[in-house]
Amino acid sequence: IKIKEDTLTQQWKATGELNRKARMLKTELFATGKKKISLPYINRRFGAEVTFDTLYYSMTEENLANNQLRLNGKARVSGLDIFHKALSPEVIHLDRGQLTYQMNIGNHTLELDSTTTVLFNKIQFHPYLRAEKKEAQWHFTAAIDKSWFPADDLFGSLPKGLFSNLEGIKTRGELAYHFLLDIDFAQLDSLRFESELKEKDFRIMEYGATPLSKMSEEFTYTAYENGMPVRSFPIGPSWEHFTPLDSISPLLRMSVMQSEDGAFFYHKGFLPDAIREALIYDLQVKRFARGGSTITMQLVKNVFLNRNKNFARKLEEALIVWLIETERLTSKERMYEVYLNIAEWGPLVYGIREASAYYFNKRPSQLTTEESIFLASIIPKPKHFRNSFAENGQLKKNMEGYYKLIAGRLAQKGLISEIEADTIRPDIQVTGDAL
């Protein structure tokens, strides 16, 4: 097969067999002269580049009872390189990938059997997928159960270019993984989500490209907007606006925590129930409206992954969160201190010290209950803080429910009395430069 695109000319060779009687197909594709195949036209159409050494595919079709169809086969690729800016800023490389599959197809069902095997560099697992249509509504199930295996099989199999912070990391010990996602679109509230990566004698022997414990000491944080750096400052005593955790009002600390992640000091980086609730809500409104992120996840996203907003970032984020929390690379107290010192509280307003001055001309230790609850409320959308105010400069009435909720939690935690909580209203005076 001769392929010509602009100035690039390729000579491909395809071998294989098609046997209609045996209902079997197998084929292999490679370039002559030990060169890589470069898929044509996708660069011009999608801005992507895909090259590989060899591609192999086979399929056998088998008719079963009740109009059931079974497909068995194998797909294999070697020397795969992929580049697209939506995936990674670098070329993604996969030495070898292989799928040995059994697929069952019915009138209203499609199932990837659990005997299916995925080989991904050094790691192997058996996924299960099922899609069933019932009365115009779909029911999807996906599951993976991977029993104990060497930890370095996972971290040594991560494709180069896709997990830049983890490239070169060396580990020891064993891991086991369980995943389940079950979505019945006729009953979204019944959605099930389970994800657990367990460890046995796990240790990081050598960091990869990034020292994952860097938050434990003073480090330079860079804030980005639209992929461009806008400010850099050290998170430690050398920054004049840095505020130690014990110099921040307990009311502010608890208000933010109860608003963003009330179980922060008790979980290990993930809250599956929060992710489940976010998935249900997103599916109900048919858009990405909630993320279910913990404070650890937000920190990792901002400190380690800020520049790489792409499809693979969530996977890398999850792995880094798991490593930091499992290995206790940074204490919870220090993580929360970092969080409050890098949080954006307005246009180019970073950290609680700048926020306290910007809104109330105060130091973080002087914030009142009402001021603390207000600052907690704007963390999700700091650039739109003015939407919280009416034309007369007072907080809008629709803030009352939020104030009541957080005040109640402050009372439960013993920071204010029940009587004080009942008197809390969305009433603040902005004396800084914000308005």
Region locations from a protein language model:
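Juxtamembrane regions of bacterial inner-membrane/periplasmic proteins
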Residues: K2-L435
